[in-house]
Design a protein with these regions (language model features):
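Surface-exposed, proline-enriched loop/turn segments that connect beta strands in immunoglobulin-like
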Residues: 39-43
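Short, solvent-exposed loop/linker segments at the N-terminal edge
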Residues: 44-49
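Asparagine-centered strand-capping/turn motif at beta-strand->loop junctions
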Residues: 54-61
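Terminal connector regions
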Residues: 114-150
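The feature marks short-to-medium sequence segments in extracytoplasmic or secretory-pathway proteins
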Residues: 61-104
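Hydrophobic alpha-helical membrane-insertion segments, chiefly the h-region
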Residues: 21-31
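Short, solvent-exposed, Trp/other aromatic-anchored flexible loops in extracytoplasmic proteins
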Residues: 87-119, 127-130
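N-terminal Sec-pathway targeting helices
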Residues: 4-21
Length: 150
């Protein structure tokens, strides 16, 4: 009988450790999954030529994201697929002009040019963990919510 109790106790300890590790793994997975950088517009509809306010939230705890000095954003229109408007080539060297720190919320105004009416979004090229003044190299792209221009 003592061997049976010893086995039962060891089995209980192994199951407890397994469940503890499983619980911690699930919590870490859900925590890491919720870390992201989000770009949203304050309105769902804009009038052609109106200023658009963008809010950028970096919910990562350990990643800084930086933006281009040439083209910090691109306006895209949905026409079956998402297509950016044509932009002239940048006349100066493309450097990192600003960054959003981990946990930071930032906002800025975008002056919308006169463009086609329809569904649009903002595309923002980012450089992860770059430094101000450094040459910008795109490591990712983040998209805003969709909005309508009338």
């Amino acid at each position: 009988m003592p061997n049976y109790l010893k086995f039962k106790k060891e089995f209980f300890i192994y199951i407890s450790v397994f469940l503890l590790i499983l619980t911690i793994s699930i919590l870490i997975f859900f925590f890491l999954r919720n870390q992201k950088i989000i770009i949203t517009t304050t309105e769902q509809e804009y009038i052609n030529g109106q200023d658009l306010k963008l809010e950028i939230k970096n919910s990562f705890l350990d990643r800084e994201y930086c933006f281009s000095s040439c083209y910090p954003y691109f306006l895209e229109r949905e026409n079956g697929t998402w297509q950016p408007y044509s932009y002239i080539e940048c006349p100066f060297s493309d450097e990192v002009s600003g960054c959003i720190e981990p946990g930071e919320l930032s906002a800025f105004l975008v002056s919308l040019p006169l463009v086609n009416v329809g569904k649009h979004r903002i595309s923002v090229p980012v450089c992860e963990d770059c430094s101000l003044g450094q040459s910008f190299h795109e490591t990712g792209r983040i998209f805003s919510n969709e909005f309508e221009i009338k």
